[in-house]
C-alpha cells in the first residue's frame, strides 16, 4: 500500500527543494462542488500529485477543494490534464498562476480533509453557497472602481489589507473570515442600494461572501473572478491600468506578490515604509509582522528586544523559558484585535 503522507523532516525536504535545478510554477485553484467521500478523494489526489512531484497545501471537504501548490515547470501541462480528467466538475477549472514567483513557495505536500474548505462559521441550513454574485473581469473591475455607486469590500484579513488593496476599498475589521461575514452584512445595511464588489486573494473567500450577502438580502453583488491574482494578470495582459495598490499577500514562503511599486505599509518597529512580512526568529514566538532591513539587522530578525535576547540564549535555556508559558512576550498584533497565536505562515482558510 502506498504511503499517503510525508515521512521526511521539513528541514530535509526544504534542502532538497532548494537543491532542485528545474524551475517550479506556483499555482492556486479552488472549486465548490460536492465530494461524496473526501477521504477517498484525498488519497487518490495525493497519489496523483506525488507522482508529478507536486508540493503545497490542499484542503478537501464535502463542499469542494482548495489548493495552493508548486509544480515542476515540465509537469504543469500534465498536471492540468490529469486534474481536469480526475472529476468532471474539475474540467476546465481556472488555475491561478503566480505573478511574482521564485519557484520556492512550498517544499512538502500536505493534503487534509476538513469540514469546510474555508472556515466560514455558517450553520444556516437554508444558505445556498451556489447562489453567488456576478463575476467581474479586469476591465469591468476598473469600470466599477470609477462608478460612484459601487463599494469595494476587501474580504481578506488585516495583515493582507495592510500591505495592499484596491483604491478606496473598505476593510472589514475582523480577525478571521468567519467573523468578517456577519460584520460585512452589518456594515453594508445602510448601503443596500449600492453595487457591492467583493474580492480576496484568489477568489475562494469572496465567492462565498458574495453568496452570503445575497442570502442576507443584498441584490447588487459582484465578485472579482480569480481574485487579485487573476485581476492583475489579466490587466497586465490587456494593457489596462492596474488599480490594486501595493503587494498581494500570499500564503506560502513568498508571503507576497508585488502588484504595484507603491509601498503603503510601515515597519512595525520603526515606522519606515516597508511591506515585507516575516516571522519572528525566536522559536518561542514566530509572530508574523512587518520588518524593514534596518530593524531586521538591529533585532536579528526578531519582533522585539525581549525575543532578540531570548533567541540568543542556549537552546536548552530557550526551551526552559518556553515551557508552560503562554505567548505573553509578543509585542505586535497580527490583526487589530488580538495577539497572534499561530506559528509560521497563517492559514488561508481562516
UniProtKB/Swiss-Prot annotation:
Keywords for the protein's UniProt record, in alphabetical order: Oxidoreductase, tRNA processing
Annotated ranges, domain Rhodanese: 146-240
Pfam families, per the entry: Rhodanese, Rhodanese_C, UPF0176_N
Coiled-coil residues: none
Catalytic center residues: 200 (cysteine persulfide intermediate)
Gene Ontology biological process: tRNA modification
Reaction equation(s) it catalyzes: uridine(34) in tRNA + AH2 + O2 = 5-hydroxyuridine(34) in tRNA + A + H2O
PROSITE patterns noted in UniProt: RHODANESE_3
UniProt xrefs under CDD domains: RHOD_YceA
SMART domains named among the record's database cross-references: RHOD (SM00450)
InterPro entries to which the protein is assigned, alphabetical: Rhodanese-like_dom (IPR001763), Rhodanese-like_dom_sf (IPR036873), Rhodanese_C (IPR022111), TrhO (IPR020936), TRHO_N (IPR040503)
EC number: 1.14.-.-
Superkingdom of the source species: Bacteria
UniProt-recorded Gene Ontology molecular function terms: oxidoreductase activity, acting on paired donors, with incorporation or reduction of molecular oxygen
Similarity section: Belongs to the TrhO family.
Alphabetized HAMAP family for the sequence: TrhO
Role of this protein: Catalyzes oxygen-dependent 5-hydroxyuridine (ho5U) modification at position 34 in tRNAs, the first step in 5-carboxymethoxyuridine (cmo5U) biosynthesis. May be part of an alternate pathway, which is able to bypass cmo5U biogenesis in a subset of tRNAs under aerobic conditions.
NCBIfam families: PRK00142.1-1
Protein name per the record: tRNA uridine(34) hydroxylase
Protein's organism: Escherichia coli O1:K1 / APEC
Lineage: Bacteria, Pseudomonadati, Pseudomonadota, Gammaproteobacteria, Enterobacterales
Amino acid at each position: 500500500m502506498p504511503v499517503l503522507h510525508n515521512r521526511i523532516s521539513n528541514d530535509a525536504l526544504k534542502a532538497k527543494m532548494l537543491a532542485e535545478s528545474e524551475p517550479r510554477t506556483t499555482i492556486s485553484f479552488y472549486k465548490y462542488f460536492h465530494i461524496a467521500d473526501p477521504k477517498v478523494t484525498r488519497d487518490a489526489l495525493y497519489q496523483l500529485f506525488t507522482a508529478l512531484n507536486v508540493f503545497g497545501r490542499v484542503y478537501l471537504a464535502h463542499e469542494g477543494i482548495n489548493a495552493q501548490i508548486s509544480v515542476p515547470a515540465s509537469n504543469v501541462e500534465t498536471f492540468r490534464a490529469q486534474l481536469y480528467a480526475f472529476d468532471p466538475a474539475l474540467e476546465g477549472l481556472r488555475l491561478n498562476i503566480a505573478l511574482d514567483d521564485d519557484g520556492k513557495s512550498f517544499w512538502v505536500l500536505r493534503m487534509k480533509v476538513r469540514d469546510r474548505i474555508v472556515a466560514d462559521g455558517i450553520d444556516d441550513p437554508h444558505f445556498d453557497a451556489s447562489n453567488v454574485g456576478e463575476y467581474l473581469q479586469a476591465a469591468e473591475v476598473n469600470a466599477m472602481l470609477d462608478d460612484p455607486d459601487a463599494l469595494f469590500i476587501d474580504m481578506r484579513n488585516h495583515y493582507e489589507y495592510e500591505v495592499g488593496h484596491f483604491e478606496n476599498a473598505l476593510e472589514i475589521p475582523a480577525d478571521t473570515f468567519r467573523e468578517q461575514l456577519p460584520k460585512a452584512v452589518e456594515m453594508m445595511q445602510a448601503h443596500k442600494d449600492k453595487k457591492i464588489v467583493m474580492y480576496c486573494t484568489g477568489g475562494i473567500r469572496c465567492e462565498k461572501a458574495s453568496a452570503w450577502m445575497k442570502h442576507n438580502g443584498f441584490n447588487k453583488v459582484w465578485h472579482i473572478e480569480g481574485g487579485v491574482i487573476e485581476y492583475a494578470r489579466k490587466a497586465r495582459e490587456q494593457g489596462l491600468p492596474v488599480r490594486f495598490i501595493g503587494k498581494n499577500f500570499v500564503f506560502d514562503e513568498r508571503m507576497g506578490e508585488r502588484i504595484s511599486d507603491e509601498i503603503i505599509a510601515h515597519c512595525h518597529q520603526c515606522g519606515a515604509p516597508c511591506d515585507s512580512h516575516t516571522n519572528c526568529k525566536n522559536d518561542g514566538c514566530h509572530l508574523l509582522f512587518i520588518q524593514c532591513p534596518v530593524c531586521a539587522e538591529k533585532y536579528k530578525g526578531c519582533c522585539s528586544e525581549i525575543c532578540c535576547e531570548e533567541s540568543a540564549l542556549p537552546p536548552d535555556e530557550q526551551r526552559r523559558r518556553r515551557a508552560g508559558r503562554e505567548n505573553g512576550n509578543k509585542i505586535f498584533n497580527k490583526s487589530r484585535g488580538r495577539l497572534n497565536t499561530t506559528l509560521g505562515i497563517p492559514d488561508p482558510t481562516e
